[in-house]
């Protein structure tokens, strides 16, 4: 990794440091339900405080901007549920989500609970600012002493954050002498606080924190210098979300395993009958192209050989349902595939266990439903059983599945960034990384 890190700066004492964190943690009734992202940010924050910096923390939380601006954007979770519905039902479901979102109070996405938790973890050295660039933030930043922290309010309470507004960037830049990005989860976003404040030349010294350093070291090195056999596993709902990832990983891996909803487009491309399973008909030709590419390169591309099917998508998502198992290319016309079957679980697991490098992004089925979680559990277990292998879980739903199923401590690395991991797997340059200073 050729980017400067916090350890490359020799004198932090008295320096004002703006640290972009990812505190977008799940909340229920104002209570944090998973604090892993907060814990992940602590090494950088503690290092800066211990070295006498005046630390200004900033982050987003959810998508309040869409409600405040009256342009509601679907969350990934909502989009996933809608995509799994029959096409005729999707528009009505989308409108129902939008109407519900418009009635919500965006202020429930305040970062104040995060500030309280940080205070508990850092010994009452964190002050919460009730705005981002307003008078409260300005006063608290000005009063911040060496070895103390100020956490700004949710950046996305300002539309200017995502629009890279120059004046907003200037106000953020006025808080600091040095910028630190430690939010890998948003490193693929080119927003005011993730990249533009440096791109506009407003802050000259910009380095990465320990969290981003770890992400880049583990994931980038495994992609560029993998031990073989190298097995990549892709799941999730849509082929369209992973076009570039499929293509790039085929160049690097020995075996590419395709599961989840995206597998049915590949199966249909092979002439299979997939019933009402999720299919992206516009990507059929692309799937054929990728299968031919794998064949031409001598790479192995594995698809499910059997599938767990049901008549309707569970509603709610964890509702009890009746299922059966059929060959993956013989799904009845009125049925849909929602998980990989037992023969596929064994096939995939054996391939994973024999690997020396494994990268996984995307669940094998609707793991939120216990009846449809067996495929995802089998993959997680296989990663845990892959002796001597480097095993990497690429954030998002895969990371959630690992945590939910109890495998988080049994793999080499779980990324903190879903979208950022995907773009790294795709070989893209991440704006939040590219803007940082290179090492001499």
Residue ranges of model-derived segments:
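Active-site loop-to-helix "anion-binding N-cap" substructures in soluble metabolic enzymes
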Residues: 1-440
């Amino acid at each position: 990794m050729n980017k400067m890190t916090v350890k490359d700066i020799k004198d932090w004492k008295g320096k004002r440091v703006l640290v972009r964190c990812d505190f977008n943690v799940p909340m229920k009734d104002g209570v944090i339900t998973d604090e892993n992202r907060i814990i992940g940010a602590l090494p950088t924050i503690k290092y800066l405080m211990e070295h006498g910096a005046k630390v200004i923390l900033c982050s987003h939380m959810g998508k309040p901007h869409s409600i405040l601006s009256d342009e509601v954007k679907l969350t990934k979770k909502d989009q996933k549920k809608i995509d799994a519905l029959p096409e005729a039902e999707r528009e009505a479901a989308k409108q129902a989500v939008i109407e519900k979102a418009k009635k919500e109070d965006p202020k429930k996405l305040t970062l104040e609970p995060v500030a309280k938790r940080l205070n508990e973890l850092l010994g009452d050295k964190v002050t919460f600012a009730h705005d981002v660039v307003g008078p409260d933030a300005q006063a608290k930043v000005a009063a911040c002493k060496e070895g103390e922290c100020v956490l700004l309010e949710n950046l996305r309470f300002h539309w200017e954050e995502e629009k890279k507004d120059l004046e907003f960037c200037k106000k953020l830049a006025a808080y600091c002498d040095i910028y630190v990005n430690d939010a890998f989860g948003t490193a693929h976003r080119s927003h005011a606080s993730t990249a533009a404040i440096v791109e506009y030349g407003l802050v000259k010294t910009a380095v990465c924190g320990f969290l981003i350093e770890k992400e880049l070291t583990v994931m980038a090195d495994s992609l560029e210098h993998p031990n073989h056999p190298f097995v990549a596993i892709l799941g999730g709902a849509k082929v369209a979300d992973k076009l570039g990832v499929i293509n790039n990983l085929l160049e690097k891996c020995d075996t590419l395993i395709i599961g989840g909803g995206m597998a049915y487009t590949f199966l249909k491309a092979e002439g299979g009958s997939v019933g009402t399973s999720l299919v992206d008909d516009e990507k059929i030709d692309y799937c054929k192209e990728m299968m031919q590419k794998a064949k031409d390169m001598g790479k192995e591309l594995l698809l499910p050989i059997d599938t767990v099917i049901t008549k309707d998508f569970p509603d709610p998502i964890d509702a009890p349902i009746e299922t059966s198992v059929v060959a993956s290319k013989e799904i009845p016309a009125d049925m849909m595939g929602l998980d990989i079957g037992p023969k596929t679980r064994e096939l995939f697991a054996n391939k994973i266990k024999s690997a020396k490098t494994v990268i996984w992004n995307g669940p094998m089925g609707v793991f939120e439903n216990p009846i449809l979680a067996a495929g995802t559990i089998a993959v997680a277990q296989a990663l845990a059983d892959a002796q001597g292998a480097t095993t990497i879980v690429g954030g998002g739903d895969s990371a959630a599945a690992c945590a939910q199923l109890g495998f988080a401590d049994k793999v080499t690395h779980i990324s903190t960034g879903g979208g950022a991991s995907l773009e790294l797997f795709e070989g893209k340059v991440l704006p939040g990384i590219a803007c940082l200073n290179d090492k001499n």
